[in-house]
């Protein structure tokens, strides 16, 4: 590769905002690599990182509180453009000689800011024009404090009636502050604001493209593993599928995938995985049929957490057994992605993103004799999907709805039995097929059937029957943190219900789950 796609990079210092990952994603959508680091990076680390631009995120603290976080001095000494967002603007103002105070009017939600003066950041950007011909922007606010006096060298960029200084700039130094959140989709011109900042003001080249990312990842994998053999646990999910396709292109037959069929997969999923990777792409895949083992270990277990642990531990047991049969494997590949890395790394101050244990970071058995290769660890999920398409994976596979690690094990309430799994597989397949036929599959974020271990009376012809209940679940969400139930058309639900009851002998009733998250979770267990 002639150009280093990481050389053009934007550093995002995180002050604890819930939107920080969105900032990184927006910058990358513009075509420039960005990374999130905790706000307490040292001056030396920042200079060594050598960013083309720096963004200071929002955060929950108050600049007016004594011990609240500040940006490292190097941020303002490096000579690169700086954009402060919300808290980031406030700490920039305070550190450079301005004043911040708590506001009597807190602004949360939609607002309209009036653009003041000329600035490279807002050039030719507007949503509306006011009666005086001034440019107005529709934005998203979320703040209690506000800047009441700008540093002497700054000019006013934007204002609202309750926040007279909603944006400020020191054009000569290329320092900018905005009180609103351009990273949130409710700020309609957010992408253009970031384009101006990153491409025009900072002069970054848009090298961060799917084709370049694939080429760079292949180079790095080859350099790292050399002629060694690599092992990958292939689940059929998006992340592991993209890793398989990427590694196969990079190192060919040095890769062996182990696909553990636990008997808790969707209808024909195991065969589809084998057809796609082994048959069509020529990837070496070992299929371990472990349905009987998983079901025997789950016998009599009702507690969801216990089921998850048993399924996870049994997977490792089967994977280890298959791995032991392979000779001279040195590397274990994993589908770790960037949000996993962020969640598992927190600054010593605890102001960065919350630490939580994640299945792909640090959850490996202590005695595993492999070194790790994680080719997706810099990428967000939407980027993983894009490079999946770049690698030639089918759209329907890359944009398939999320499926839980324990599979149908957490969609069968209570004890897992083969009879229940078989019924659920059929019901789920009918639901998904009809969603696709009605062009509703990609309008929902996640849709699936749930097996309820309760019996209900039904009538077929003249005969009374007493059979199981299936619940359908479909939700719409942006981030999976909150979700609303999908308002599917009644005729579609009627068709799905009729098919399930008529085509599956063990089901007498179909219900539709109309619970939103919160308070309900998306999965039932």
From Swiss-Prot:
Entry keyword annotation includes Thylakoid: no
Catalytic activity, EC: 6.3.5.2
InterPro entries: Class_I_gatase-like, GATASE, GMP_synth_C, GMP_synth_GATase, GMP_synthase, GMPS_ATP_PPase_dom, NAD/GMP_synthase, Rossmann-like_a/b/a_fold
Pathway: Purine metabolism; GMP biosynthesis; GMP from XMP (L-Gln route): step 1/1
GMPS ATP-PPase domain boundaries: 208-400
SUBUNIT field: Homodimer.
Protein name: GMP synthase [glutamine-hydrolyzing]
Organism of this sequence: Teredinibacter turnerae (strain ATCC 39867 / T7901)
The organism's taxonomic lineage, starting at the top: Bacteria, Pseudomonadati, Pseudomonadota, Gammaproteobacteria, Cellvibrionales
């Amino acid at each position: 590769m002639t150009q280093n796609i990481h050389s053009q990079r934007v550093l995002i210092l995180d002050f604890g905002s819930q939107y920080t990952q969105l900032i990184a994603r927006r910058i990358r959508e513009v075509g420039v690599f960005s990374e999130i680091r905790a706000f307490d990076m040292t001056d030396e680390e920042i200079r060594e990182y050598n960013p083309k631009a720096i963004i200071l995120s929002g955060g929950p603290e108050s600049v007016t509180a004594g011990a609240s976080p500040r940006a490292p001095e190097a941020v303002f000494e490096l000579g690169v453009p700086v954009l402060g967002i919300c808290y980031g603007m406030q700490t920039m103002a305070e550190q450079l000689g301005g004043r911040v105070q708590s506001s009597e009017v807190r602004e949360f939600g939609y607002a309209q800011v009036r653009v003041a003066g000329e600035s490279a950041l807002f050039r030719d950007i507007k949503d509306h024009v006011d009666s005086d011909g001034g440019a107005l922007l529709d934005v998203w606010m979320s703040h209690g404090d506000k800047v009441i006096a700008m540093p002497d060298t700054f000019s006013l960029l934007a204002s609202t009636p309750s926040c007279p200084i909603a944006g400020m700039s020191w054009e000569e130094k290329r320092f900018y502050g905005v009180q609103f959140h351009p990273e949130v989709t409710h700020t309609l011109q957010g992408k253009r604001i970031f384009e101006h900042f990153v491409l025009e003001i900072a002069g970054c080249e848009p090298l961060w493209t799917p084709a370049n990312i694939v080429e760079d990842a292949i180079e790095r994998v080859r350099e790292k593993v050399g002629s060694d053999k690599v092992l990958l646990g292939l689940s059929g999910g998006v992340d592991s599928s993209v890793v398989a396709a990427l590694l196969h292109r990079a190192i060919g037959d040095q890769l062996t995938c182990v696909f553990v069929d636990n008997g808790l997969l969707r209808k024909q999923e195991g065969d589809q995985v084998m057809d796609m990777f082994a048959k069509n792409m020529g990837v070496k895949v070992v299929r371990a049929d472990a349905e009987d083992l998983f079901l025997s270990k789950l016998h009599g277990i009702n507690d969801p957490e216990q089921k998850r642990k048993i399924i996870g531990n049994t997977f490792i047991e089967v994977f280890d057994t298959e791995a032991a049969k392979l000779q001279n494997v040195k590397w274990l590949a994993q589908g770790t992605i960037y949000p996993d890395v962020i969640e598992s790394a927190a600054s010593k101050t605890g102001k960065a993103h919350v630490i939580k244990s994640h299945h792909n970071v640090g959850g490996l058995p202590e005695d595993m004799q492999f070194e790790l290769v994680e080719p997706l660890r810099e990428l967000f999920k939407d980027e993983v999907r894009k490079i999946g398409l770049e690698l030639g994976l089918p759209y329907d596979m890359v944009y398939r709805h999320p499926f839980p690690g324990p599979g149908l094990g957490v969609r069968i309430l209570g004890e897992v039995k083969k009879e229940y799994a078989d019924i659920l597989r059929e019901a789920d397949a009918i639901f998904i097929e009809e969603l696709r036929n009605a062009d509703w599959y990609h309008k929902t974020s996640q849709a699936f059937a749930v097996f309820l271990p309760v019996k209900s009376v039904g009538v077929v012809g003249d005969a009374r029957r007493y059979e199981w209940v299936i619940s359908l679940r479909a939700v719409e969400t942006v981030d999976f943190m909150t979700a609303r139930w999908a308002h599917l058309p009644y005729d579609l639900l009627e068709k799905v219900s009729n098919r399930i009851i008529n085509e599956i002998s063990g089901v007498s009733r179909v219900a539709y789950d109309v619970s939103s998250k919160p308070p309900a979770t998306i999965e039932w267990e």
